[in-house]
């Protein structure tokens, strides 16, 4: 009995030590959270000191590009609108190739293998763009990295439109992909680091909405230029308009305040915070205090050698808190990509042609898939923080499976003799699959942008972004070969559907909840041992199952949605 108690005590001590080790000098962060909860005087002292420094420096920066609103919340919406336009560019450039696919191969004399490389060139380039994410974010900041990505978008689109051979079109697609990869990993972090926690998940989800909107616009552009000579050139070059608008819009936006503190530019961070969040609201003052304490404690830990100062990447292997975030975020991304969504998006017009539509009809019918994805993102934008991350992950994956089953079954009927059955089943499955994926896709940007510690966030997003586009490249490049090897039903139902089924089991057990938490509180969540999270999730599953079986639907859905957004993770100092 004594030995058992001793082992139990040792386990508790080991877990405490693990938390302290994983978070380095996070005692300062814990204390900052407690000060914020109890309204300590330290918060006002910090704000007063920053105001004094601001007065000595001559006040807030003035100038043509220094936009300021009477109500800081209006600045938040401006910031999110322009930053998230990167999602629109990304989605637009992903779907434009679908319409161009009907004409480009014949005009340039491409083989089937060469056309696969053209389609997969952008996700391949995006892997390279993701690898640029860390150095670009560390040396140029979040804002600078976004501007660089826009320049790459512009160069790539211009070269695409003017391509005269296979080498030129592939090169332009890779350059375009560099912009997609760099921007895709930067914008969600930029938004997550600048907006208030209660709407963070909703506004990061807006990025996915813009991706879906861009994909719909891409299909619409394909339809507009369908009967124009040289149509695919106009289709691929149309994104130049949006990249130009976004470039000028980004010039008016500030740098991320968390990044500025990370760079030891505390006064600049305070200036930005005052412009975009204000200091009149108590919650905003508390969040600035906690953010400052958290980032400073991380930087001190690095400086004192508690972490791998020269090789920050190593913390993903040596620090349990960072490792948990890396494993979870990247498995979640893989589960989405390996269900084939990007292959379906890129080959949408070709797939429509395979089930009986002519080229013109195929282009128009592509709007069905893109429109379903767009509509599917809307609930997540408004309800991400209300229902939480686990709800969206666990309820969306079964929708993938059902949609893929219908798509797979549709291939079992003869297009020549049962055309209506084939098209009915296929389109129904496509609508269900894309609709459910719209909400899940929001998580692939929300979760990676919030789970990594500040000093590793750009490195973490590099791995997540690179993995996302690497999986997209693999799925897209091998789509035709896999379809020929497995059969259309085997690929849709067996492979893609099987991934969705496995993913559901993983999310049920291993996905922690991070809704309504500051980025600093999420540090605490991922400092807990994985088995603690699994036990907590399993207890929640049993309770939810019991409530559903006994007819208490109100407690499962309504009460969860009414959770007080001010609820925060409690930190024990025992």
Curated annotation (Swiss-Prot):
<feature type="topological domain" description="Cytoplasmic">
    <location>
        <begin position="137"/>
        <end position="143"/>
    </location>
</feature>
<keyword id="KW-0812">Transmembrane</keyword>
<feature type="transmembrane region" description="Helical; Name=7">
    <location>
        <begin position="331"/>
        <end position="351"/>
    </location>
</feature>
<feature type="transmembrane region" description="Helical; Name=2">
    <location>
        <begin position="116"/>
        <end position="136"/>
    </location>
</feature>
<feature type="transmembrane region" description="Helical; Name=5">
    <location>
        <begin position="206"/>
        <end position="226"/>
    </location>
</feature>
<feature type="transmembrane region" description="Helical; Name=6">
    <location>
        <begin position="234"/>
        <end position="254"/>
    </location>
</feature>
<feature type="topological domain" description="Extracellular">
    <location>
        <begin position="98"/>
        <end position="115"/>
    </location>
</feature>
<feature type="transmembrane region" description="Helical; Name=4">
    <location>
        <begin position="174"/>
        <end position="194"/>
    </location>
</feature>
<feature type="topological domain" description="Cytoplasmic">
    <location>
        <begin position="448"/>
        <end position="465"/>
    </location>
</feature>
<dbReference type="InterPro" id="IPR050814">
    <property type="entry name" value="Myo-inositol_Transporter"/>
</dbReference>
<feature type="topological domain" description="Extracellular">
    <location>
        <begin position="165"/>
        <end position="173"/>
    </location>
</feature>
<keyword id="KW-1133">Transmembrane helix</keyword>
<keyword id="KW-0813">Transport</keyword>
<feature type="transmembrane region" description="Helical; Name=3">
    <location>
        <begin position="144"/>
        <end position="164"/>
    </location>
</feature>
<keyword id="KW-0472">Membrane</keyword>
<feature type="transmembrane region" description="Helical; Name=8">
    <location>
        <begin position="364"/>
        <end position="384"/>
    </location>
</feature>
<feature type="transmembrane region" description="Helical; Name=9">
    <location>
        <begin position="391"/>
        <end position="411"/>
    </location>
</feature>
<feature type="topological domain" description="Extracellular">
    <location>
        <begin position="352"/>
        <end position="363"/>
    </location>
</feature>
<dbReference type="InterPro" id="IPR005829">
    <property type="entry name" value="Sugar_transporter_CS"/>
</dbReference>
<dbReference type="InterPro" id="IPR003663">
    <property type="entry name" value="Sugar/inositol_transpt"/>
</dbReference>
<keyword id="KW-1003">Cell membrane</keyword>
<feature type="transmembrane region" description="Helical; Name=10">
    <location>
        <begin position="427"/>
        <end position="447"/>
    </location>
</feature>
<comment type="function">
    <text>Transporter for myo-inositol. Also appears to transport the polyketide mycotoxin fumonisin B1 (FB1). Does not appear to transport hexose sugars.</text>
</comment>
<feature type="topological domain" description="Cytoplasmic">
    <location>
        <begin position="195"/>
        <end position="205"/>
    </location>
</feature>
<dbReference type="Pfam" id="PF00083">
    <property type="entry name" value="Sugar_tr"/>
</dbReference>
<protein>
    <recommendedName>
        <fullName>Myo-inositol transporter FST1</fullName>
    </recommendedName>
</protein>
<feature type="transmembrane region" description="Helical; Name=11">
    <location>
        <begin position="466"/>
        <end position="486"/>
    </location>
</feature>
<feature type="topological domain" description="Cytoplasmic">
    <location>
        <begin position="512"/>
        <end position="574"/>
    </location>
</feature>
<dbReference type="InterPro" id="IPR036259">
    <property type="entry name" value="MFS_trans_sf"/>
</dbReference>
<feature type="topological domain" description="Extracellular">
    <location>
        <begin position="227"/>
        <end position="233"/>
    </location>
</feature>
<dbReference type="InterPro" id="IPR005828">
    <property type="entry name" value="MFS_sugar_transport-like"/>
</dbReference>
<feature type="topological domain" description="Extracellular">
    <location>
        <begin position="412"/>
        <end position="426"/>
    </location>
</feature>
<dbReference type="InterPro" id="IPR020846">
    <property type="entry name" value="MFS_dom"/>
</dbReference>
<feature type="topological domain" description="Extracellular">
    <location>
        <begin position="487"/>
        <end position="490"/>
    </location>
</feature>
<feature type="transmembrane region" description="Helical; Name=12">
    <location>
        <begin position="491"/>
        <end position="511"/>
    </location>
</feature>
<dbReference type="GO" id="GO:0005365">
    <property type="term" value="F:myo-inositol transmembrane transporter activity"/>
</dbReference>
<feature type="topological domain" description="Cytoplasmic">
    <location>
        <begin position="385"/>
        <end position="390"/>
    </location>
</feature>
<feature type="topological domain" description="Cytoplasmic">
    <location>
        <begin position="255"/>
        <end position="330"/>
    </location>
</feature>
<comment type="similarity">
    <text>Belongs to the major facilitator superfamily. Sugar transporter (TC 2.A.1.1) family.</text>
</comment>
<dbReference type="GO" id="GO:1904679">
    <property type="term" value="P:myo-inositol import across plasma membrane"/>
</dbReference>
<dbReference type="GO" id="GO:0005886">
    <property type="term" value="C:plasma membrane"/>
</dbReference>
<feature type="topological domain" description="Cytoplasmic">
    <location>
        <begin position="1"/>
        <end position="76"/>
    </location>
</feature>
């Amino acid at each position: 009995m004594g030995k058992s108690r001793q082992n139990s005590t040792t386990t508790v001590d080991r877990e405490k030590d693990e938390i302290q080790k994983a978070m380095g000098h996070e005692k300062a962060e814990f204390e900052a959270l407690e000060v914020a909860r109890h309204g300590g005087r330290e918060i006002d002292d910090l704000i007063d000191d920053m105001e004094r420094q601001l007065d000595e420096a001559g006040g807030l920066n003035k100038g043509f590009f220094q936009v300021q609103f009477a109500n800081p919340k209006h600045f938040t919406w401006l910031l999110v609108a322009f930053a998230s336009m990167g999602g629109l560019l990304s989605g637009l450039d992903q779907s434009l190739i679908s319409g161009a696919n009907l004409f480009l191969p014949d005009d340039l004399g491409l083989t089937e293998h060469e056309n696969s490389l053209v389609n997969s060139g952008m996700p391949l380039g995006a892997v390279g763009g993701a690898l640029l994410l860390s150095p670009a974010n560390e040396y140029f900041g979040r804002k600078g990295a976004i501007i660089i990505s826009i320049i790459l978008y512009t160069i790539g689109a211009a070269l695409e439109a003017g391509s005269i051979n296979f080498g030129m079109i592939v090169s332009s697609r890779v350059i375009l992909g560099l912009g997609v990869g760099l921007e895709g990993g930067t914008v969600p972090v930029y938004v997550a680091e600048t907006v208030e926690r209660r709407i963070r998940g909703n506004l990061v989800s807006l990025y996915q909405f813009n991706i879906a909107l861009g994909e719909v616009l891409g299909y619409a552009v394909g339809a507009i230029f369908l009967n124009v000579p040289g149509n695919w050139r106009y289709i691929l070059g149309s994104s130049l308009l949006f990249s130009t608008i976004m470039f000028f819009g980004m010039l008016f936006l500030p740098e991320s305040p968390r990044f500025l503190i990370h760079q030891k530019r505390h006064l600049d961070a305070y200036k930005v915070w005052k412009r975009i969040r204000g200091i009149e609201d108590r919650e905003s003052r508390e969040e600035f205090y906690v953010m400052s304490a958290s980032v400073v404690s991380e930087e001190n830990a690095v400086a004192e050698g508690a972490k791998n100062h020269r090789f920050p990447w190593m913390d993903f292997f040596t620090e349990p808190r960072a490792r948990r975030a890396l494993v979870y975020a990247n498995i979640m991304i893989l589960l989405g990509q390996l269900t084939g969504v990007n292959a379906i998006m890129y080959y949408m017009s070709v797939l429509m042609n395979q089930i009986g539509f002519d080229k013109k009809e195929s282009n128009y019918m592509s709007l069905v898939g893109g429109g379903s994805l767009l509509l599917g993102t809307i609930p997540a934008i408004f309800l991400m923080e209300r229902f939480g991350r686990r709800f969206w992950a666990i309820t969306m994956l079964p929708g993938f499976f059902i949609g893929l089953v219908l798509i797979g079954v549709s291939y079992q009927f003869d297009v020549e003799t049962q055309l209506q059955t084939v098209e009915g089943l296929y389109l129904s499955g496509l609508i269900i699959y894309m609709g459910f994926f719209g909400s899940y896709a929001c998580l692939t940007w929300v979760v990676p942008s919030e789970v990594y510690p500040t000093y590793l966030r750009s490195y973490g997003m590099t791995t997540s972004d690179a993995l996302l586009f690497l999986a997209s490249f693999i799925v897209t490049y091998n789509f035709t070969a896999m379809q020929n090897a497995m059969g259309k039903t085997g690929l849709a139902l067996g492979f893609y559907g099987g991934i969705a089924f496995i993913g559901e089991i993983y999310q049920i057990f291993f996905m922690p909840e991070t809704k309504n938490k500051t980025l600093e509180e999420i540090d605490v969540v991922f400092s807990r041992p994985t088995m603690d999270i699994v036990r907590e999730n399993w207890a929640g599953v049993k309770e939810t199952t019991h409530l559903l079986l006994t007819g208490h639907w109100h407690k499962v859905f309504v009460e969860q949605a009414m959770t007080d957004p001010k609820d925060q993770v409690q930190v024990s100092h025992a």
